[in-house]
Amino acid sequence: ILIESVPGLAKTTAAQTLATCVSGSFKRVQCTPDLMPSDLVGTQVFDFASQKFTTQIGPIHANFVLLDEINRSNAKTQSAMLEAMAEGATTIGGQRIALPKPFMVIATENPIEEEGTFNLPEAQMDRFMMKAVMTYPSPDEEARMLAMLTRRGSDMIGPDTITGERISVSDVDFLRKAARRVHVSDAIMRYAVDITATSRGAGSRPIKGLSSLVRLGASPRATTALTRIGQAKALLSGRDYVVPEDLKAFAHEVLRHRIMLTFEALADGVVSDQIVDKIVETVPVP
């Protein structure tokens, strides 16, 4: 999951809280320009006592990994991160080490600051299943947050304040497998394909003039992600089958970082969410 927002909206706290709710291992990596792949993945260290190399695994070998401000890490380190995400394993000194299951990467980025940052390439952005954009809270929500801070006498709301029973790793694995068993009809599959194909200028009802706004549409990986998330949404709704509303509910999160706009569209102030709105509105619902 990629989380984007301006500073001060608790991206890091939200990611930490999600990981803390599950009793699995959690590691946080503060990304900086000098962060090396070995700092993340691990390395081999020579032990003078035994005269042998020993493998020290890095922080990415955890159930939940928070990559804070991922766009501050250099391209080489970003590639190492996303290789682990894609393959579910790392290679240290020629030795292939599998990552624990479940494995989830939560990355945050600040879209405003550009100095000392390295934007994620399109191919690497596509590795993220979802991209969530956090917006400012409403005045009522901000007032409730302030009231919570005042009552607790603390200036921060941290994940360590969570009380109650946490979800076990085995529970998460069970829910993942249960979601995969949710029925997806042929009509829903075609609907998911139609949504992503429309972003590429194809589909059953191509959008006129889309090529002047979009230079790169969503890949087939987006179709898979949209279907998987639809299955999870159906499971959480108490159904054993997927309906079109399950896909539409998360179309923005799945597609917004996979649709690359043209320079003309960016100059006119067009954002990818507007394109997704048009796609969802245009594609016929089965």
Predicted regions and their residues:
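Conserved AAA+ ATPase small/helical "lid" subdomain
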Residues: I157-S204, K208-T223
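Canonical AAA+ ATPase core
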Residues: D47-K52, S73, M85-V182, Q231-K233
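Walker A/P-loop
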Residues: I1-T32
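Conserved beta-strand position immediately N-terminal to the Walker
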Residues: I1, V65, F103
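Walker B catalytic acidic pair
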Residues: S5, D68-E69, A80
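Residue-level signature of catalytic and energy-coupling elements of molecular machines
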Residues: I3, L40, M81, F128, ...
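C-terminal engagement/docking regions of AAA+ P-loop ATPases
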Residues: K177, G201-P286
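Conserved alpha-helical scaffold flanking the Walker A/P-loop in AAA+ ATPase domains
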Residues: F46-L66
